[in-house]
Amino acid sequence: MAAKEVKFHSDAREKMLRGVNILADAVKVTLGPKGRNVVIDKSFGAPRITKDGVTVAKEIELEDKFENMGAQMVREVASKTSDLAGDGTTTATVLAQAIVKEGAKAVASGMNPMDLKRGIDKAVEAIVQELKTNARKVTRNDEIAQVGTISANGDAEIGRFLAEAMQKVGNEGVITVEEAKTAETELEVVEGMQFDRGYLSPYFITNQDKMRVELEEPYVLIHEKKLSNLQALLPVLEAVVQSSKPLLIIAEDVEGEALATLVVNKLRGGLKVAAVKAPGFGDRRKAMLEDIAILTGGTAISEDLGIKLENVTLEMLGRAKKVVIEKENTTIVDGAGSKDEIQGRVSQIKSQIEETTSDYDKEKLQERLAKLAGGVAVIRVGGSTEVEVKERKDRVDDAMHATRAAVEEGVLPGGGVALLRAAKALDSVQAENEDQKHGIEIVRRAIEAPVRQIAENAGAEGSIIVGKLREKPEFGWGWNAQTNAFGDLYNEGVIDPVKVVRTALQDAASVAGLLVTTEAMVAEKPKKEPAVPAMPAGGMDF
């Protein structure tokens, strides 16, 4: 086992604080509408330019092991905030730095670290409650656009695209961000349920120009096994022909004689039909077929339910307003399923998302949720160069998470003002002793840090801005760094989602509290590499 180096007390805290400061100082220059960019060198390709706090934090690795531990703890703050709220990573880093700085001073002066931490925790709880009390619900489209614009560093186009996407696919819908092949940014919305399986035979195509199958008001037959013989299906196929409606068959596979029979019937005009493979694999395939059944108001025919193909009736088939099948995907628009059943299925998937620990499963469940609840929107981000596209994509990602968070929990005045205003909640927090009281005061001072940093990045004096904000107690009144003017931030569209502000403070205080209560640090001793002997000169004999 390699030898370890151990540091104690103030020696450990100093090293750790130095690491915290290096990382936080690099991240905090990006805060606010006039925040600067950070250029990150890459081992391959062009350098990356970003204004996203968590991207900067993830790139920082320090040579000194003890300093690096401090930096990594704050990096964890940014990552956690990014995972939970998707934005607010720079605010979280600034808050963590402020709490650790003040906390380290207090411990050095002889205060009890555990009581300080208890005081910090009490203060954070009170502020979070105050933030929730003052939250405003977001309902209008222009408010969603404002949140997106603020998060995208004042880019109104991004805000507009996000508001439009959320309007089209709903709050549960999936919005994905991709890099465009052109210089323009564009939005594409797929309404209804889409899955990545196309037609099994080109003979099913009804629209030759667009090379796709279009079925108006079709019946939908959902079967979890392979279909190789249609004998058992004849009664239901005849009933579909009588109704003169088209039919979509979704099965594990349709092969051989069954596929040939369907194609011949389609070409002769007896039965408007198309067949596609079922989406997904294994258990997820079964779940997705049940989703389609609930969406279309049909029954997924499976042996588990004891339903045989020969017993299938028209009532067991699903219905939809329209189905469009392309070479590689199928879209079911406006399924005839009951709203209550769809809502019940949505709630079930939501609880599965909360319970799962796997990121992969969570992503797949969210995709299923979106397909049931609304649709999928794709924002393709354009730019003149690859570097510009990547930088813009970072901002769109931030903005997308911020708009989601805003719809979820509401909004507060932005620019760090909400935290400053919430400080009044600390007046009623009861401390058990002087050290706890000092912990509460640490948070009172720390929550000024975001406003000060935004002001400094905009070239203003942080203390003067904070002083002026204190003169007027109205919750929504604050300083707009973009215009360098005071006013009602709600009216000016300077707003932050409650979830982002709350998560930033909670995560920052959680990690900062751990750093303040650290008394010893252990790291591996750096190995002294033996010097490599010089190569002998060529052509010499030994």
UniProtKB/Swiss-Prot annotation:
Cellular localisation: Cytoplasm
UniProt entry tagged with the keyword Isomerase: yes
EC number: 5.6.1.7
PROSITE patterns xref list: CHAPERONINS_CPN60 (PS00296)
CDD domains noted in UniProt: GroEL (cd03344)
Major localization listed first in the record, in broad terms: cytoplasm
A single MF term (Gene Ontology): isomerase activity
Catalytic activity entry: ATP + H2O + a folded polypeptide = ADP + phosphate + an unfolded polypeptide
Enzyme class at the top of the EC tree: isomerase
GO cellular component terms given for this protein: cytoplasm
Residues the entry annotates as binding ATP: T30, L31, G32, P33, K51, D87, G88, T89, T90, T91, G415, D496
Source species, domain of life: Bacteria
Family note: Belongs to the chaperonin (HSP60) family.
Protein purpose: Together with its co-chaperonin GroES, plays an essential role in assisting protein folding. The GroEL-GroES system forms a nano-cage that allows encapsulation of the non-native substrate proteins and provides a physical environment optimized to promote and accelerate protein folding.
Quaternary context: Forms a cylinder of 14 subunits composed of two heptameric rings stacked back-to-back. Interacts with the co-chaperonin GroES.
HAMAP family named among the record's database cross-references: CH60 (MF_00600)
Annotated NCBIfam families: GroEL (TIGR02348), PRK00013.1 (NF000592), PRK12849.1 (NF009487), PRK12850.1 (NF009488), PRK12851.1 (NF009489)
Record protein name field: Chaperonin GroEL 2
Taxonomic source organism: Mesorhizobium japonicum (strain LMG 29417 / CECT 9101 / MAFF 303099)
Encoding gene (name): groEL2
